[in-house]
């Protein structure tokens, strides 16, 4: 049995959006939630953010549900495997990893790729590009 670490926030605005974050580090997940909430507040968006810690939880969350944006922030091969598995199940995938996987992200045509550490500016740019469909940077 798995436990989905669910943290939901709603911001009232013109349209709603659902985002899920997969990161095995609780403090990094919380930081990303804060960055996304700040971005949503500035854009006056209604938003729901859910979080999970690994592929098994993410796969369960993706099953039978369409998310607006899926964010995978896992290092190494685990990140590659998770991003590769999540990509066919999501319209927009943001992958956060190290430079070694940048070429693979480009080949996979993920919505956006950037390197750790995560900053508010990087996250906001990734969200904007993913929504506009601008591809990997």
Kindly label every feature range from the protein language model.
Residues 30, 60, 103-104:
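Alpha-helical elements of the RecA-like P-loop NTPase motor core of helicases
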Residues 51-69:
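Acidic, metal-coordinating helix/loop segments flanking the phosphotransfer/catalytic sites
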Residues 68-136:
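CheY-like receiver
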Residues 26-50:
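Two-component/phosphorelay signaling modules centered on CheY-like receiver
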Residues 23:
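Conserved acidic carboxylate
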Residues 1-16:
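Short, Lys/Arg-enriched N-terminal segments with co-localized hydrophobic residues
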Residues 13-14, 62-67, 87-88:
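Flexible, charged surface loops at secondary-structure boundaries
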């Amino acid at each position: 049995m798995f436990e989905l670490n669910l943290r939901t926030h709603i911001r009232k605005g013109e349209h709603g959006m659902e985002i899920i974050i997969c990161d095995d580090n609780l403090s990094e997940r919380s930081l990303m939630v804060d960055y996304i909430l700040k971005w949503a507040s500035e854009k006056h968006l209604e938003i729901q953010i859910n979080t999970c810690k690994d592929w098994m939880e993410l796969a369960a969350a993706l099953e039978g549900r369409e998310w607006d944006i899926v964010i995978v922030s896992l290092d190494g091969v685990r990140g590659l495997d998770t991003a590769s598995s999540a990509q066919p199940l999501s319209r927009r995938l943001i992958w956060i990893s190290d430079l070694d996987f940048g070429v693979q992200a480009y080949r996979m045509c993920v919505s956006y790729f950037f390197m750790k550490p995560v900053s508010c500016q990087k996250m906001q740019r990734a969200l904007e590009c993913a929504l506009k469909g601008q591809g990997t940077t």
